């Protein structure tokens, strides 16, 4: 009886561990990747053209938290609202709100203008080589 009880307890323990592992990896979907984290923007591709923020004084970044996003685009701060469903992120409204400073060099402004004017609509959330990527028909954003 004692041996049977030990075997039953061991089987329950291992079955519980196995189901916990499967459940936690299955429940971790791509939209959880964006929640409550600060991401540095590595580069963006807009309509086939690559924009790199290498000359920005501070790395462009974005943070997603409680259906609000906040970021720095190389010169100005920006913010807005979003919703996630399955593997998509929907930017609410037809444009992102931002401060309006003029900055140099011009490639920083080009990066910023391309990012902010195209950061709208629905983006697919994906994980490429361990890095977060947001993409739609017009733009692809690569994060560090």
Indicate residue ranges for each PLM-predicted region:
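Sec-dependent signal peptide recognition
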Residues: 2-8
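Lipid interaction determinants
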Residues: 6, 17-144
């Amino acid at each position: 009886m004692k041996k049977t009880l030990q075997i039953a307890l061991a089987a329950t323990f291992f079955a519980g561990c196995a189901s916990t592992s499967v459940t936690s990896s299955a429940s971790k979907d791509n939209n959880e990747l964006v929640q409550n984290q600060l991401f540095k923007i590595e580069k963006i591709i807009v309509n086939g053209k690559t924009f790199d923020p290498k000359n920005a004084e501070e790395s462009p970044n974005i943070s997603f938290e409680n259906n609000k996003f906040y970021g720095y685009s190389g010169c100005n701060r920006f913010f807005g609202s979003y919703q996630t469903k399955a593997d998509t992120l929907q930017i609410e409204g037809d444009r992102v709100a931002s401060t309006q400073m003029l900055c140099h060099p011009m490639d920083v402004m080009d990066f910023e203008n391309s990012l902010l004017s195209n950061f709208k609509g629905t983006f697919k959330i994906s994980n490429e080589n361990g890095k977060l990527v947001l993409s739609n028909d017009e733009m692809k954003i690569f994060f560090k």
